[in-house]
Amino acid sequence: MSGDTCLTAVCPASGAKPKTYSFKGGCLGNKYIRLNVGGCLYYTTVQVLTRHDTMLKAMFSGRMEVLTDKEGWILIDRCGKHFGSILNYLRDDTIALPKSRHEIKELMAEAKYYLIQGLVDKCQTALQDTNDTYEAVCNIPIITSPKEEEKLIESSAKPVVKLLYNRSNNKYSYTSNSDDHLLKNIELFDKLSLRFNGRVLFIKDVIGDEICCWSFYGQGRKLAEVCCTSIVYATEKKQTKVEFPEARIYEETLNVLLYETPRVPDNSLLEATSRIRSQASHSEDDDGFELRDRVRRIHVKRYSTYDDRQLGHQSAYRD
């Protein structure tokens, strides 16, 4: 055993309650003493316990009476959970405070009992710092893998709006307005996340295969997708065009707000947001099957080609 202080904490064996004897702390002649603090056993030195002007100094300098059992353990009727930290502070005036506010409060209560004002001040400062810590109101996860995306969506109790944008996916040159439209999509995503952050989980995907695409999820399932890119021909040269379908994005965002309720299947809710043009002759069971298994996907496309499709063609299909 070396050093000024040797500290251990062990749990004593269960058995009969030890008898205690009273004597004066000033009679302690050994350098090392044994402490039983609430059932936890510690070895330390009188020098450490009397280094600061505390209740422990009064106990072990003869000013207060202490109790020992028949085996020589000095008894202190307090919780021993944080006594090791208290001894560390008494030894070198430093301490690694617990991360939990609850445990810091426990340690501060023990420090107040032993009249260790320096440790009380450190605990109060730590508690004040945690109160002053600002937690971000709007947190937007950035997807790092498809597996992470799947877990986020499945575990979210809120509807989910995802914006995938990855400008490097383009094989061709962009049209003149594409960069501006891509920026507008990102700006709209930021505005929506600030407006609905408490009701909708907004996530960003910068590793996907699309250039700019919105996805909308409710109760763990994909409800709609708005793809904002298309390939156009200009002077016999392919170009990538990025659109900004603002009205459609607002509409789909408002639709997912209907899915803030717990995850209970609701065919009427699915029917109201899926926009499936079912024939009147379909049975209710067939309608329910189609509503659950279809995802609305809207691709805003503009064509200027040499085929028979007209300029301004917009296709909307489901799969």
Curated annotation (Swiss-Prot):
Subunit text: Component of the BCR(TNFAIP1) E3 ubiquitin ligase complex, at least composed of cul3, tnfaip1/bacurd2 and rbx1.
Q: Which SMART domains match?
A: BTB
UniProt-listed InterPro entries: BACURD1-3 (IPR045068), BTB/POZ_dom (IPR000210), SKP1/BTB/POZ_sf (IPR011333), T1-type_BTB (IPR003131)
Give the protein family. Answer: Belongs to the BACURD family.
Q: Which stretches make up the BTB domain?
A: 31-99
Its BP terms in the Gene Ontology are:
cell migration; immune response; negative regulation of Rho protein signal transduction; proteasome-mediated ubiquitin-dependent protein catabolic process; protein homooligomerization; protein ubiquitination; stress fiber assembly
Could you list this entry's UniProt keywords, alphabetically sorted: Cytoplasm, Endosome, Nucleus, Ubl conjugation pathway
Q: Which pathway features in its UniProt record?
A: Protein modification; protein ubiquitination
Record protein name field: BTB/POZ domain-containing adapter for CUL3-mediated RhoA degradation protein 2
Q: What role does this protein play? A: Substrate-specific adapter of a BCR (BTB-CUL3-RBX1) E3 ubiquitin-protein ligase complex involved in regulation of cytoskeleton structure. The BCR(TNFAIP1) E3 ubiquitin ligase complex mediates the ubiquitination of target proteins, leading to their degradation by the proteasome.
A Pfam family per the record: BTB_2
> What is the gene name?
tnfaip1
**Any GO MF annotation of the entry:** ubiquitin-protein transferase activity
Q: Which Gene Ontology cellular-component terms appear in the entry?
A: Cul3-RING ubiquitin ligase complex; cytoplasm; endosome; nucleus
Q: Which organism is it from?
A: Xenopus laevis (African clawed frog)
Signal peptide feature range = none
Localization, UniProt: Cytoplasm; Nucleus; Endosome
Predominant place of localization = cytoplasm
